[in-house]
A protein has these predicted regions:
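Periplasmic OmpA-like peptidoglycan-binding domain that tethers envelope proteins to the cell wall
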Residues: 1-23, 33-126
Length: 126
């Protein structure tokens, strides 16, 4: 789903308090991720692939943070679909070591798929 659950909103509210510090000008990247299962049912009508779904997740978080007072110019949304499973490092993804076989292995049970349906918030360097 792309809808923000109440517990996520509470967490983002706390995080937004840190992100609204006027002295902090770092960029903030919001990453959306999915498992390797294609969207189904009603969600597939709006988000036919995991690329659209992961991008929409990230965009919803960005919109919520802007609503909470974070400067929009600091925020970037990016969707990764299933291409960056939980536990894979930046260098593994960038070097091509995370291929369809690895992605399948990292989505082989419900717990792994749940872990892969996530948002990451990354702060730039000061």
């Amino acid at each position: 789903s792309v809808l923000l659950k109440e517990e996520i909103k509470l967490l983002l509210q706390e995080a937004s308090n840190l992100m609204t510090n006027p002295d902090d000008k770092r960029g903030i990247l919001i990453e959306g991720h999915t498992d390797n299962q294609d969207p189904k049912g009603k969600i597939a009508e709006r988000y036919p692939t995991n690329w659209e779904l992961s991008s929409a997740r990230a965009a919803n978080v960005v919109n919520y943070l802007i609503f909470k007072g974070v400067m929009s110019g600091r925020l970037t949304a990016s969707g990764y679909a299933d291409r960056w499973p939980s536990g894979a490092t930046w260098s593994e993804v960038r070097s091509g070591k995370v291929d369809d076989m690895v992605i399948g292995d990292k989505n082989s049970n419900p717990e792994q798929r749940t872990n892969n349906r996530r948002i990451k918030i990354i702060f730039g360097v000061k």
